[in-house]
Amino acid sequence: MRSVLSLALLAANVVTAAVVSPFDYSGYKVIRVPTQKDNVKEVQRVITDLNLDTWKYPKSEGQNADIVVPPSQISSFMERISGMNIEMMHEDLGLSIRNETSFEAYSAGYAPDINWFKSYHSYQDHLSYLQDLQGLFRTRSEYVDAGKSHEGRTIPALHIWGSGGKNSKPAIIFHGTIHAREWITTMVTEYMAWSFLSQYNKNADITSIVDNFDIWIFPIVNPDGFAFTQTSNRLWRKNRQPNPNARCPGRDLNRNYPYQWVGPGSSSNPCSDTYRGAQPGDGTEIKVHIANMKKIAANKGIAMFVDWHSYGQLFMSPYGYSCTARPPTDARHQELSRIFAQALKAVHGTPYKTGPICNTIYQVNGDSVDYALEVLKVKLSLTAELRDTGARGFVLPADQIIPSGEETLAGTVAMLKAVIQG
């Protein structure tokens, strides 16, 4: 199976900050094929034989195959899957991307409000927005340049605290956009930052949360990959770090954490979307994030870590590396996951599934959740797959940003209230 990442090699083969012509997805279709016992092997063969990219690969029966089909292969693909049920996710992927990437201009110094969340934005505008947002609440927050990416971009963070003062409470850490193409996670983590700051002393639940925790929000964990999705290839997933003796750049940063690094839940192939890297923790951005998490943990410890992804509408607990092992805190993780999902659904009716990562989505090696729990000894370590379940997938329309933020905030507030209550 050809990786989505390999498409970008048509546009760029080196890791630089230079602007590259965007890969054109005009005429590409994204088609979902639900699998079952009698067709899963054939769907896998079609993907392999036609060398097709997937957003979701069906590793076993019952899993959906979300397949990217170029114009030149549509006839062959439709012939091979004749008689199978299909769902059209994107009739013209290029058109969907053009609609999604109609960014609204942002003027630095603007007082941030709900209008920010009516559009997606450029990487540089995100930096301006975060600094402007923090500037409105200087006594209860700080904007932090957490470190530099491989290409030298800022990895931004917002640090938020309440009545006890900075670094006086156990920390909550949220990560977004570790996978470059998951734009909704950037916006949703920023929506939560905006809410925690603007609703403090206005909303009792949010005030209690901010008073009880030191909150760290990293909306763009993978800035090089994120910027690349905006200039060159919308579907890029990995970072942009070169791989020696390999034509394919990039590591999957969520397979690069130095815990349970090797296994079937990651790949040793540099051209794979799930390439784990040459060594555990050798991703430039992973080194930055591990250093930051250790520094945060050295204060009052880390009460909770959540890594926000898309898509799938899932809220998951450890482990990723094993489908049979369970942490001693499994029951608590499951309880909080259900609380999150129930509160989220109450807002817009959006259903989320919950459960351990390996059993709920797929096996994952070298991931952030397992590392945080087992190496950093974070008390509660979780991950989410935000909207949707595949109707639009990674290319989620901008009109879903605000409802995604509203429901995710509600789930998060309910979950953190339960943590405070014990």
From Swiss-Prot:
It is found in: Secreted. Residues 1-17 form the signal peptide. It comes from Trichophyton rubrum. This is Metallocarboxypeptidase A. Transmembrane segments: none annotated. The active site is at E385 (proton donor/acceptor). Keywords: Carboxypeptidase, Disulfide bond, Hydrolase, Metal-binding, Metalloprotease, Protease, Secreted, Signal, Virulence, Zinc, Zymogen. It holds the Pfam family Propep_M14.
